[in-house]
Structure formats: C-alpha cells, structure tokens
C-alpha cells in the first residue's frame, strides 16, 4: 500500500510551515536584513527578531519596533534579506 504523500521530498511550502526543528534539514527562522531609512536613505543592518527599538544612525528615525516574535518595520521602510 503506497503512502499518500512523499516523506523524503516534501514541498517547499510544507517545509516552511513546519517547526524549525522538525524540518528535513534544520535551519532557523531568523535572519539579518538591510533596512533603508525613508528619511535619509541610509542603510542599517537589523536582526529580524530584534528585541529593542532600532533607530536610524543618521536621523534618529525609528526603523522597527519589537513584537513578540519578528520586529515590525515602520511604514515607509524597505528591506532585503542579507545573503550569507
């Protein structure tokens, strides 16, 4: 009797929904990102799960606010994930 789903080759969407420890290959959910300030356009490196308020170095504008998990970016801020 064949299985209904392939356990060795799960789809990427299934893997993303699983807990970080129960994935086929374990990896964390957090990452570093470059955040561009909407006022002075300087780029700052911010941790995705920052636990403190992060302000811009140039103009002291708040870039992100901590929440229970991921940090919430301020409106107007753009970001991209840093590559390894």
Curated annotation (Swiss-Prot):
Component of the small ribosomal subunit. One of its GO terms (biological process) is translation. Its main location: cytoplasm. It comes from Homarus americanus (American lobster). Binds 1 zinc ion per subunit. The keyword Zinc-finger applies. It is found in: Cytoplasm. A zinc finger (C4-type) spans 37-59. InterPro entries: Ribosomal_eS27, Ribosomal_eS27_Zn-bd_dom_sf, Ribosomal_zn-bd. This is Small ribosomal subunit protein eS27. One of its GO terms (cellular component) is ribonucleoprotein complex. Its cofactor is Zn(2+). The keyword Disulfide bond does not apply. Gene3D superfamilies: Zn-binding ribosomal proteins. One of its GO terms (molecular function) is structural constituent of ribosome. Keywords: Cytoplasm, Metal-binding, Ribonucleoprotein, Ribosomal protein, Zinc, Zinc-finger. Component of the small ribosomal subunit. The ribosome is a large ribonucleoprotein complex responsible for the synthesis of proteins in the cell. Required for proper rRNA processing and maturation of 18S rRNAs. Belongs to the eukaryotic ribosomal protein eS27 family. The lineage of its organism: Eukaryota, Metazoa, Ecdysozoa, Arthropoda, Crustacea. Signal peptide: none annotated.
């Amino acid at each position: 009797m064949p299985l209904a789903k392939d356990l060795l080759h799960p789809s990427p969407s299934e893997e993303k929904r699983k807990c970080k420890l129960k994935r086929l290959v374990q990896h964390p959910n957090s990452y570093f990102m470059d955040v561009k300030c909407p006022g002075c356009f300087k780029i700052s490196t911010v941790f995705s799960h920052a636990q403190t308020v992060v302000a811009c170095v140039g103009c002291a504008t708040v870039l992100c606010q901590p929440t229970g998990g991921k940090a919430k970016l301020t409106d107007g801020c753009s970001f991209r994930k840093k590559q390894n």
